[in-house]
Amino acid sequence: MEVALPNVPTKMQHPFTKYSEWKFKLFRVKSLERRPSEEETEGSEVSYNSSQETYPKSTVVLEDLSLGSAPQSPTNFKPQQSEKSNVVDNHETDLKRLEEEAHITVIQQLCRICGASFKMDQQNRSYPVHGPVDSETHDILRRREKKVTSWPELISKVFKTDVRADVDTIHPTQFCHNCWTIMNQKFSNISSEVYFPHNQAVEWTPHSANCYVCHSSKPWGKRKSAPQLNPHKMKKRKRGPEFVKKSKTSSGNSIQWKNMKAFNQMKDSCKKIHLDNNLLVLDYPSDFVKSVSCLVCEHILSDPVQTSCKHLFCRICILKYIKLMGCYCPSCKYPCFPTDLTVPVKSYLNVLNALLLKCTVSGCDEEISLGKYSHHISKHKETKGKEVYAHINKGGRPRQHLLTLTRRAQKHRLRELKMQVKAFADKEEEGDVKSVCLTLFLLALRARNEHRQADELEAIMEGRGAGLHPAVCLAIRVNTFLSCSQYHKMYRTVKATTGRQIFQPLHALRNAEKALIPGYHTFEWRPPLKNVSTRTDVGIIDGLSGLNQSLDEYPVDTISKRFRYDAALVSALKDMEEDILEGLKAQDLDDYVSGPFTVVVKESCDGMGDVSEKHGSGPPVPEKAVRFSFTVMNISVPNKNGPVRIFEETKPNSELCCKPLCLMLADESDHETLTAILSPLIAEREAMKTAELLLEMGGILRNFKFSFRGTGYDEKLVREVEGLEASGSLYICTLCDATRLEAAQNLVNHSITRSHCENLQRYEMWRSNPHHESPDELRDRVKGVSAKPFIETLPSIDALHCDIGNAAEFYRIFQLEIGELYKNLSATKEEKKRWQATLDNHIRKRMNLKPIMRMNGNFARKLMSKETVEAVCELVPCEERQAALTELMDLYLKMKPVWRSSCPAKECPELLCQYSFHSQRFAELLSTKFKYRYEGKITNYFHKTLAHVPEIIERDGSIGAWASEGNESGNKLFRRFRKMNARQSKFYEMEDVLKHHWLYTSKYLQKFMNAHNNLKNQGFTVDLDNPDLEQRLESSMESLESMEF
């Protein structure tokens, strides 16, 4: 960098014109007149451009600044006025420009926030004040759900400094790594040794004659300048003592001095409320005394709190210190905020409360432990108060009645009485002040013959008040889909209308729901579960917890919340505790049977499309969701004559028993995301297969074993999790190895051959190709396995999706029969669309069935009926085709109950026996009358319906009971809970939906809700004295039930 001085004499040219990075070589031109500070002292002013004054001749002195000091400001020196005023003006302009450039160069090497030099950091790291935050900070803010994306916003939040209106000539444009670390540490849990060097951010001012940045007397680090080259040319004026320059304290030091003064006053005031460590009875080591003393006031700790750097203070002392001196630890200068303060561990508090102290009351020589010291002192005050207490009215305003006073005045007037009641409660009732006061109130009511209020108070004291049980209120809130705010409004309305607390407040409901959410009950596994924590107080966790860090190469863009599988099963069993104990009694078994109980669990998983919401903050995630749930199907216990079933789910396809386990905003087709979320859950499931659960139930420790059956999957998801090709594959079935052609040629005679273990073996063969076969030969060997299976499913048929798939095929057959495709196999697409429109219009008129874009369960149930076939036959001209179509539907309706019923052996034994005959006749019709459609091909669900139903029922006893219908119904609840009961945030809404859905499936709450509904149906009302209030309460309850939230 070269600097030229135009219009400057040759003798004033600088010998060096290049500047290094750390050293500046500047001219200093000094005049023989006084400095500006001296002129201010003497009360005179001198103007540079004044033509009326005569300036003596100046000399040029070259000064070399030492390393690390700021360049000397040329404003301390005045050039001599020459004979030509324009030359002087040019000199002044050039010097001002040079000093402003030097000022800007200096401030660009300083931090905008704390003013520290970047050279203090060995790596010379700095960050721009204006602009977006860096990637590391952005990730931290994203995890903490902060919307801040730029440095000015973040600096404003952390340091309370607005940098948006900064000017480059006044303010630095960079900040240091120390301030960057403080900002990151504010929003993360990572601690590091960093502290803010000042109590407040530096205030920057424009460059002036007394600029503390450029001037040699800057407040943070003045260094002695190099010796002058020509000291004999400088003339020092003699000055009297009245002109000696007073040392000026900077504004920062003044503020610090005031803060220190306030801090000392605070320490003095602590003597009145805190105990000095000289009161300790024993002669403890000095280090121990320090460990039990506050590091601010140096007294014994009172209400101790611990900072994140593990230092201990009195709560009031550290809060006052932070307010006065800044948010950092007084001991180590580590950043410390009031929200970071925590209570020390209980063992330390026990040691602290056990310290023996001398009583400060004169005449008392007792030695009291610190924990009982306040109680001991209160006894002295009580004794003194009894001696001197007497009501004295010294005139002035008359004493008002107690009930007309404010709460603060009531406390003041009743203070002595409160102390006496507390002393009595501590002595006689183990400190139960509430019971003493309630009993006094009860006796006062009885003495005044106010027995009605006394009865109500007594009922409240005994826990049998007129209000509803908190569990009933919680059941009402969950089953009516009320959010917390809606319930609170209803609670206040009913309380204000009736004057009674019929419903319980929200905090009572939250206490009730804690015992119903997983993570409340303690349990143990033998042997301990592999790779699963032994903690039992685990509630809702992030869906990605337990995921290996090696998966960071694939970004998982999803939000997922789940329960830990074992904790969820424990909570479900405790929720069914009454049912299990009643089952033992019903089977004439002893109540103290310890097991082992065998619990059979049905697992279901399904994807949901289009769950997008207009609201919610957070990262962009797919607008699809996946739900994983389970249902406890039955529980059995071994007996002499074999296992005895003590519990069986009566409605296995109800949404009331299908408990949610995991929710995620993801696409079920995204194999990587699905694997990342469900793999930890599946690992917990595999670990539980070989372990026994020890759980206390009915006061006895009992053993439980679990059997998991993955049957609630549709065909698409089965192929996804078992590593099979998609549903359009050549290999048509997920239960056997038949190809589509083999299934069409032999419609009935097939058996289940696939299994999870075999799919794993075939995947290894597909991956390694040990026989070095061609792709077609290898595919034929592995029978359609193309990915690694990661969830074990039971080879079965999902009854709900079987209905939907078969109904879609019948819907297609109806269209083709209307168009008589058997006559003309080369029909165009326009003709087929016309046939579909004709069918839709006809069944809309006759059956009131509106056409839909995608087949669902309700449409399938209405479509598959005799009425529908009769309506379709009106559009089929040929009577022979009408008879074939009617017979085909009749056979289907005879087969359907076999796979739809929960127990076909009890519900439809005749149809179960005739199933093979009906399936043979159904297959015969397809291969003859409907040969035009099923020659050489067959649909997936027709194949499963005709070939595999008898074998599955023989193995499991039912197909319908193991269907995914409960999980499908849970999908509707997911949408409703997300809309009504969840916070509007992508992170928190999943947690809220999971919690509310779990409470909705609680059998404990369902019993309370059923009992409440029975009482309401029987005409049960609250016994109120005022009939008008009763009518208003009933009308408010009716309006509540009629509300559509």
Swiss-Prot record:
DNA-binding region (UniProt annotation): 395-462
Keywords for this protein: Chromatin regulator, DNA recombination, DNA-binding, Endonuclease, Hydrolase, Metal-binding, Multifunctional enzyme, Nuclease, Nucleus, Transferase, Ubl conjugation pathway, Zinc, Zinc-finger
Residues noted as binding Zn(2+) 3 in the record, renumbered to the chain: 309, 311, 329, 332
Keyword Hydrolase among record annotations: yes
Site note Essential for DNA hairpin formation, participates in base-stacking interactions near the cleavage site, residues: 899
Annotated Gene3D superfamilies: 6.10.140.510, Classic Zinc Finger, Zinc/RING finger domain, C3HC4 (zinc finger)
Catalytic activity: S-ubiquitinyl-[E2 ubiquitin-conjugating enzyme]-L-cysteine + [acceptor protein]-L-lysine = [E2 ubiquitin-conjugating enzyme]-L-cysteine + N(6)-ubiquitinyl-[acceptor protein]-L-lysine
Subcellular location: Nucleus
Keyword Amino-acid biosynthesis part of the UniProt annotation: no
Cited SUPFAM superfamilies: beta-beta-alpha zinc fingers, RING/U-box
Cofactor note: Binds 1 divalent metal cation per subunit. Mg(2+) or Mn(2+).
Biological process annotations from GO: adaptive immune response; B cell differentiation; chromatin organization; T cell differentiation in thymus; V(D)J recombination
Tissues expressing this chain: Expressed within the thymus, liver and spleen in juvenile frogs, and within the thymus and bone marrow of adults.
Binding site for Zn(2+) 4: 359, 364, 376, 380
EC number(s) stated in the UniProt entry for this protein: 3.1.-.-, 2.3.2.27
Zinc finger residue ranges, RING-type: 294-333
Cofactor(s) this protein requires: Mg(2+); Mn(2+)
GO molecular function: double-stranded DNA endonuclease activity; endonuclease activity; histone binding; metal ion binding; protein homodimerization activity; sequence-specific DNA binding; ubiquitin protein ligase activity; ubiquitin-protein transferase activity
Free-text note regarding domains: The RING-type zinc finger mediates the E3 ubiquitin-protein ligase activity. The NBD (nonamer binding) DNA-binding domain mediates the specific binding to the nonamer RSS motif by forming a tightly interwoven homodimer that binds and synapses 2 nonamer elements, with each NBD making contact with both DNA molecules. Each RSS is composed of well-conserved heptamer (consensus 5'-CACAGTG-3') and nonamer (consensus 5'-ACAAAAACC-3') sequences separated by a spacer of either 12 bp or 23 bp.
UniProt record similarity statement: Belongs to the RAG1 family.
Assembly and interaction partners: Homodimer. Component of the RAG complex composed of core components rag1 and rag2.
Name of the protein this chain belongs to: V(D)J recombination-activating protein 1
The organism of origin for this protein: Xenopus laevis (African clawed frog)
Encoding gene per record: rag1
